[in-house]
Amino acid sequence: MSTIKVNNADIYYEDSEPNDSQKSVIVFAHGLLWSSRMYDKQVEHFKKDYRCVAFDFRGQGQSQTTKDGYDMDSLTQDTIALLDALGIDKCHFVGLSMGGFVAQRIAIRHPERLLSLSLLETSADPEDPKNIPEYRKLLKAIRWLGMKRVSQKVMPIMFGSTFLAAKERKADRKEWLSVLQSNRKGGTIKATTGVIDREGIYEQLGDIQTPTLIIVGDEDAATPYTKSERIHFAIDGSKLAIIKGAGHTSTVEEPEQVNRVLGEFLDNIEGWY
């Protein structure tokens, strides 16, 4: 558990094997309003065989909130700078939602840094215009009321109906609601604005030659199956997997399914090297 100065921000990261140069590296990039914690179950599962690095984007989790630098291009530059600072030449890159926006840009602009690309609950398109007014209202509510007051409204965006209804997941729901409520107002507003205002990169996906896995929850309302299918059709040779009973946060909702699908994909990639 450390922080490192990346561009003009102190970036928080966790590194399971900071001194191990023998293992292949998996880098995990989280979604909007979350942090590296959303990959706890993946890091625990994969750290025996891989060096696992999970980090918090600026303004989120335990990373510093800065005045600017929240557009997807800047976050991509931050991520490459983090890899450089940690001495990571190549890695398996896993990005969920906003982390997937960044992951796709890395694959397009810095393909030499990737062993593989895994995209979870994400999109290559700009924000759907019909969603923008609702997100603007959400930002206004956060600005005036704070994250704690609006977090209950965010839960159905982040999680599917299976997770939200399961009695045995009550403690999990309470834990992740608390994580949402802990978001800092300033960082949340800046990061959300960066997501809303992002440019689409769909037309560039054909340039991606990196082995790619696309994962989507069958209950994902924020970036539904059709978004993942579009990416799948655009990236030659990519694989598409559906996680049953998961919404927009499959790493938390159905970690065993995600770990199995991701593990099988990584095993195949590792066999090529």
Regions picked out by a protein language model, each given a short descriptive name:
Residues D218-T223:
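Acidic catalytic loop of the alpha/beta-hydrolase fold
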Residues S238-Y273:
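Catalytic active-site module of serine/aspartate enzymes centered on a nucleophile-bearing elbow/loop
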Residues Q104-R109, L114-W144:
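Flexible "cap/lid" loop of the alpha/beta hydrolase fold
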Residues D128-P133, M147-G206:
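Conserved alpha/beta-hydrolase catalytic His-Asp/Glu region
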Residues S74-C91:
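Conserved acidic catalytic loop of the alpha/beta-hydrolase fold
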Residues I208, I214-V216:
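Short beta-strand/loop motif that positions the catalytic acidic residue
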Residues A9-D68:
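Conserved HGGG/HGGXW glycine-rich cap/lid loop of the alpha/beta-hydrolase fold
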Residues G95, G99, A103:
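Gly/Ala-rich beta-loop-alpha elbow adjacent to hydrolase catalytic centers
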